[in-house]
Amino acid sequence: MSNTLHRLPDQLRPNLRLVFVGTAASTRSAELGHYYAHPGNRFWRAIHEAGITPRRYQPGEFAALIELGIGFTDLSKTGAGMDHQIAAETIDVPGFRAKMEKYRPRTIAFTSKKTASLFYGMPSAAIALGRQARDGSWPEIFVLPSPSGAASGSWTLEPWRELAAWIKSRAD
């Protein structure tokens, strides 16, 4: 099966209040065509419990979040699987940067330290969770613990709550 079949559609438009960025679609997400679709993934519960969304959405409802000012993309639009299974050549940081410059979201949230490490070009161990130092004209950037069930040892909701508080403090 071609990796291009695994692509999830970007959910982007100008001036979103928040864009969630993953490394690549999980195998399950790629099969279903929905972000964070694996039953063990905590994403949908986390964004609700943290106060980012007014209710708990289901993976198949991801497109509805654009009406809340929330978008989605991945650094690899053609790879699928767990982070360690994603081929390096499918990671497109320049393409991601171009999308963010085009759409100018207010806040970017990487949904794992691995994703942030690929963006920043530094080891995951060197990246702290939470709000990152401001980088010039770039939007605010948060790094969240991976909601994947495979990353349960490092799970905490606190950075997600920090993100929710930040978003609410900047509401129009």
Which role does the model predict for each range below?
Residues 6-13, 56-65, 99:
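Short amphipathic alpha-helices and their capping/turn segments at secondary-structure boundaries
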Residues 1-17, 38-39, 82-97, 123-172:
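C-terminal capping/extension of enzyme domains
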Residues 20-23:
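N-terminal nucleotide-binding beta1-loop-alpha1 segment
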Residues 67-124:
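Internal catalytic-core helix/loop-beta-alpha segment
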Residues 25, 115, 148:
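Short, glycine/serine-rich, charged loops/turns that create anion-binding
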Residues 18, 35, 107-108:
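A residue-level structural signature of the nucleotidyltransferase/glycosyltransferase Rossmann-like core
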Residues 29-32, 118-121, 153-154:
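Short glycine-/acidic-enriched loop or helix-start segments at secondary-structure transitions
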